[in-house]
Amino acid sequence: MNRTLFAPVIAVLGLLLQPSAWALDEAGSQRLLSIQQRWAEVQYDTPEKQKPAEFEKLALQAQAFTQEQPTAAEAWIWNGIVVSSWAGAEGGLGALGKAKQSKASLEKALQLDPAALQGSAYTSLAALYDRVPGWPIGFGDADKADALLRSALQLNPNGIDSLYFWGDHLYRQGHYVEAKAALLKAKLAAPRPGRELADEGRRGEIDALLKDVEHKLD
């Protein structure tokens, strides 16, 4: 499996979510934030060659979190994100298998609480459907991504992630005017306390995609 098929998943998934987690106690919320912040460190401050090993370590922590908090959708969301990031960093034949594991974790989160972390499971799962190859190689499906993103926007209409992924989806579908509007709105989203590095990375992605959109509109 070509690593480039999954590389975008690293960036797009791990930037999701605010640190608030109403279904978790204080210790669980701190554990969640620790995983989120470590993800950002690996993603943005770690050399490429070291990322697979570091994501593998973080995946073990995320899996342990789901075992400790099996009814917390937040734990399953981040397990899915970390495993997907590991797949993107490692590449190779195992990438699709890890993407499927990520999908299963996100679906579990939706079963437990679709509204957890402002519906971020919808957004994360949509990102997978938009980026993983379609049949017969993988499970990618633009129509499913569209439906999931609409659900995410109902729960979080002004979030930087839901708007970014919606703009990205519209761009992929050739709806450049609508994509630009969504991305410009995403730039106005409020910052997320504790997720400064993630927000910085997301805004960089927004700016980069806006350049691509403008090129298509020229």
Write out the residue ranges for each language-model feature.
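Helix-turn-helix repeat elements of alpha-solenoid scaffolds
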Residues: 48-63, 95-104, 138-146, 182-183
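TPR alpha-solenoid repeat register
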Residues: 75, 119-121, 162, 196
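Terminal, low-structured helical/coil segments at or just beyond the last alpha-helical repeat
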Residues: 182, 188-218
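Short coil turns that delineate tetratricopeptide repeat
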Residues: 70, 114-116, 157
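N-terminal leader/linker segments that initiate helical-solenoid repeat arrays
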Residues: 21-61
